Amino acid sequence: IIGLLKKAAEKEGIIFGLSSHRLENAWFFNGGMEFPSDVQDTTITLYGRRSEKEVYSEDVCIDFLKHTHELIDKYQPQLIYFDWTVNKIPDYFNKFLAYYYNCSLDWGKGVIVNAKHGYPTNILVGDVERGKLNEMRKYPWQTDTSIGKHSWGYVNGEENKTPDQIIHDLVDIVSKNGNLLLNIGP
């Protein structure tokens, strides 16, 4: 599926990027251990290795690196977005950054890493989820938000933002050296 998305994006001249939540999989799906679900099936690798909430064993960190390196090697994304917790594993995340940035030199094209917490904004593009900044930033930054006022996906009865609200946010964000990643949920 990723390969097909990359091919379609490139056909249209769109820069191809990926989002990875692999690190959060270590604890995010643990609730599925409390009732019968596919999270309990150890033959399914979708969920990665498990750990207690926000405790990252070496196995979990190595799994994160292997999975992320595989995505880089197979698909050469020009952008990788991380939600939440990469700041909790600085040694491993620094290895990822070095690998990805060195790959970009081999490819002869620039790359971008988006993350939320704990890294200087001259190393990667900081992300503010569903928020804005009070003033302009020297380095580029991003906010990610959804057209839904409360959800990222389908919720019965969800109220969407108006076009005027979205345009107002976009103008404010861009005027402060930011960009808007807009989720259009189902």
Predicted features along the sequence, with ranges:
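Mature catalytic domains of secreted/periplasmic carbohydrate-active enzymes
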Residues: I1-P186
